[in-house]
Amino acid sequence: MKRLVILGGGESGVGTAILGKQKGWEVFLSDKGSLKPHYRETLNKEGIQWEEGTHTEEKIL
């Protein structure tokens, strides 16, 4: 399975994550700051793994 890592959990990052998931990619989104609550809910609903407050090197490389 192809893997897509997205840095940044704003509108375009979350949109890209959803599109990648729909296209069959394994998606991981990482944001150094904090995600807006409705973006967290959307990512959880779509089954997309994510983190906030850090960029964990082992997860993004």
Residue ranges with predicted function:
Residues 1-61:
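N-terminal leader/targeting and accessory segments in enzymes
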